[in-house]
UniProtKB/Swiss-Prot annotation:
It comes from the Bacteria. This is UDP-N-acetylmuramate--L-alanine ligase. Cell wall formation. It catalyses: UDP-N-acetyl-alpha-D-muramate + L-alanine + ATP = UDP-N-acetyl-alpha-D-muramoyl-L-alanine + ADP + phosphate + H(+). Belongs to the MurCDEF family. Signal peptide: none annotated.
Length: 479
């Protein structure tokens, strides 16, 4: 009997869990929601869900036997035993209202993830940036070591063709979402914090101290024999470490890191470095991802794997053969246009620090290329809160095509839109950005902008990802 079968049997022995047969997801098309739904459908639960449109996540779930309903309707929850809700769903959603009227339990995504983690050895990855890549790297190392983990990732793991998988071992590797503080529901055995910056501040009442305390509380959900893995290069991580009453393993480029990277060198898409660990020989590695920020993500994976006595051969092979994640510096191809050959890369980063890391990786790997960025800001509140940082970072490309803000359901905020950002960047004087009023217009603008040898980077967390794939299918608008 596999561990997965044991967990199913154990749940069936709990009287309370025997009542749960039908689980309904409101917002099932999101990567995090869809990932949990995929694990549960493979565990034998009847899964249904709703969303406003189909996508690759819903298509996969349908192929696995889940029922997906387009649109939100009160009768969709009629036979559900529990309703799982995405943080993006408004409380006025008809399915939420109907579930309350029927007294059907409503839980957040993280609560259901915590239930999956209850009987497993959980590894939870938190932090403002790098969660998806770090989670993917850890899952890949464990898979290479034949540990066959269950994983739930916020992006598409290319090697698996999915963002979630039900494994047969006791391991569950998952992202921990701090955006709504719901990661406090999790009780893992190992917790990773990549970094801490001011983001999602509405959740924390605009109080950065409250955000930091919440991360400390997250680490204190570890058992006393658990391990906190923290990037010591991050200033806030270093600041909160004295408050953490658990064993800590640090990683970074810093000399005092327990797992330290040395001799970093980037050649195109690959990063080369040496890792130094206590009581182990130095290990030369090639990571099939660009940029120092991705080396930090890899160090987290190395730290977690080393604590679990995974062999170095598996670590080396997993990092060298890593096939990447969807929309994380994703190389979409080289295109022969009327203006010459252009390289297209798509990236999800939408915080100034993430955008800067992507720019640095592009500069380091392709120093001779002109960097053209098509950037779509994500959320008016983030644009407002980090406005000056966006102006500074976006000024560092050679040519900027700036789209309007992808609202993600927020109301517009005066002075925090794409036009205002464009004006401020122009006033800074380093570059003369081009405002693109509608995503549909980007393809018509590109032929007048692109030059031979350019690297075109589509950047942002909104629908620019779908737009980049459309550009790839139409030869960057030259057809």
């Amino acid at each position: 009997m596999t561990n997965t079968e044991k967990y199913k049997q154990l749940r069936s022995m709990i009287p309370e869990m025997r009542r749960i047969k039908h689980i309904h997801f409101v917002g099932i098309g999101g990567a995090g929601m869809g990932g949990i739904a995929e694990v549960l459908v493979n565990e034998g639960y009847h899964i249904s869900g709703s969303d406003i449109a189909t996508n690759s996540v819903t298509d996969r779930l349908i192929s696995l036997g889940a029922k997906v309903i387009i649109g939100h309707h009160a009768d969709s929850v009629e036979h559900a035993d529990v309703v799982v809700v995405s943080t993006a769903i408004n409380h006025e959603n008809p399915e939420i209202i109907a579930a309350k009227e029927r007294r059907i339990p409503i839980v957040r995504r993280a609560e259901m993830l915590a239930e999956l983690m209850r009987y497993r050895h959980g590894v939870a990855i938190a932090g403002t940036h790098g969660k998806t890549t770090t989670t993917s790297l850890i899952a890949s190392v464990y898979a290479q070591a034949q540990r066959d983990p269950t994983f739930v990732i916020g992006g598409l793991l290319n090697s698996a063709g999915t963002n979630a998988r039900l494994g047969t071992s006791r391991y569950l590797i998952a992202e921990a979402d701090e955006s709504d503080a719901s990661f406090l529901h999790l009780q893992p055995m190992v917790s990773v914090i990549t970094n801490i910056e001011a983001d999602h501040m509405d959740t924390y009442g605009g109080d950065f101290e409250k955000l930091k305390t919440t991360f400390v509380d997250f680490l204190h959900n570890l058992p006393f024999y658990g391990v906190a893995v923290m990037c010591i290069d991050d200033e806030i991580n270093r600041e909160i470490m004295p408050r953490v009453g658990r064993q800590i393993v640090t990683y970074g480029f810093s000399q005092d890191a327990d797992v330290q990277a040395l001799n970093f060198n980037q050649i195109g898409h690959q990063s080369q470095f040496v890792v130094r660990r206590k009581d182990k020989e130095d290990l030369a590695l090639v990571l099939n991802l660009p940029g120092e920020h991705n080396v930090l993500n890899a160090l987290a994976a190395i730290a977690v794997a080393s604590e679990d006595d995974i062999d170095d051969e598996s670590i080396v092979k997993a990092l060298a053969e890593f096939e990447g994640i969807g929309r994380r510096f994703q190389h979409l191809g080289e295109f022969n246009t009327a203006n010459g050959q252009v390289m297209l890369v798509d990236d999800y980063g939408h915080h100034p620090s993430e955008v800067l890391a992507t720019i640095k990786a592009a500069r380091a790997g392709w120093p001779d290329k002109r960097l053209v960025m098509a950037y779509q800001p994500h959320r008016y509140s983030r644009t407002r809160d980090l406005y000056d940082d966006f102006v500074e970072v976006l000024s560092q490309v050679d040519c900027l095509l700036l789209l309007d803000v992808y609202s993600a359901g927020e109301a517009a905020i005066p002075g925090a839109d794409g036009r205002a950002l464009c004006r401020s960047i122009r006033l800074r004087g380093q570059i003369d950005p081009i405002f693109v009023a509608s995503p549909d217009q980007l393809a018509s603008v590109l032929p007048d902008v692109l030059q031979a040898g350019d690297l075109l980077l589509t950047q942002g967390a909104g629908n620019i990802g779908a737009l980049s794939k459309l550009l790839a299918s139409t030869n960057l608008g030259f057809e």
